[in-house]
Amino acid sequence: MATHDNTEHVSDATDEAVGWESKLRYFLNSDFVRSAPYWGIPFVLMSIAVYGGTGYNFAISFTDYEGLGTPDYSTLDLEMYAQALSSDAFIAAAQNNLVLLVGFTTICLVLGLFLAILLDHGIRFSEKFQTVYLLPMSLSFVVTAQLWLWMFNVESGILNLVVTTLGFNPVDWLGNPSIALGAVILALIWQFSGYTMVVYLAGLQSIPDDQFEAARVDGASITRTYLRIIVPQLKEASVSAAVVLMVFALKAFTFLYALVGRYRPPNGTDILATLMVRRAFKFGEWAYSAAIATMLLIMALGVIGPYLYYQYKQGGL
């Protein structure tokens, strides 16, 4: 009897070992493992450069590190965050960020929708207009900044040429703090309104023509048709375009730096990104800048996170 029991135990152990060997063999032959040489190295490098750098930045934001030597992790606190949140410069930069975020995104969406509706109606040369409107999107922030720097020039800029032709005095677009941020928003709108136009145009062309015909038969005006029937169906296009625009608004440092060629942008246009870089590279306040960078990351996650969660719930990820 004991011999029979031992035989059963040996048989069970053998079956279990064979099962594990089969699972291991299946795993080693899976596409995940076989493709590891192709995605593994990039993943490791990205993890070190991106996630490692982000983690290091987060860690030094709790210290008083000034860029020399090794950070002292013996006393970690929230002093840098407290200094930033109580600083007038930080609050002013955050307000400018908010104005840039809301103003730039809203106007781009409205203008892009208007242009998309015009092109969707099949106006003459619509394909050529579409190319012209989208062309600025292909330019880098540096090129756009230099182009608009010339256009904003007080003496020879094309904008002031128009202003003086109309009988008004030249405007110092970037030297006047009350309008400088508006000038920056104008330049960014010029660059990105074509992007929102293409997004909305794709959404409009996916809507069946039957809906337009039914609205026309019911006697609805063009304006009422778009406001009540068409625009509500562009919700997903609006959300996806808004997320992209807000992310670009948070990344406006490159544009502002290229506009003036230094860490200090025109008065009235300082944003959190320019403040962060200036305090780090000009004043050596690395821990303080790391705290600002962490808060910027939280803002970016606040923009992208809900969108990704929504896409996940809808099965889009």
UniProtKB/Swiss-Prot annotation:
It is a multi-pass membrane protein. Induction: Transcriptionally up-regulated by both L-arabinose and D-xylose via the pentose-specific regulator XacR. InterPro entries: ABC_transporter_permease (IPR051393), MetI-like (IPR000515), MetI-like_sf (IPR035906). Keywords: Cell membrane, Membrane, Plasmid, Sugar transport, Transmembrane, Transmembrane helix, Transport. One of its GO terms (cellular component) is plasma membrane. It comes from the Archaea. It is found in: Cell membrane. PROSITE patterns: ABC_TM1. The chain crosses the membrane at residues 40-60, 98-118, 132-152, 179-199, 241-261, 290-310. The keyword 4Fe-4S does not apply. Pfam families: BPD_transp_1. GO terms for biological process: transmembrane transport. The keyword Phosphoprotein does not apply. Residues 94-309 form the ABC transmembrane type-1 domain. Part of the ABC transporter complex XacGHIJK involved in the uptake of xylose and arabinose. Responsible for the translocation of the substrate across the membrane. The complex is composed of two ATP-binding proteins (XacJ and XacK), two transmembrane proteins (XacH and XacI) and a solute-binding protein (XacG). Belongs to the binding-protein-dependent transport system permease family. This is Xylose/arabinose import permease protein XacH. It comes from Haloferax volcanii (strain ATCC 29605 / DSM 3757 / JCM 8879 / NBRC 14742 / NCIMB 2012 / VKM B-1768 / DS2) (Halobacterium volcanii).
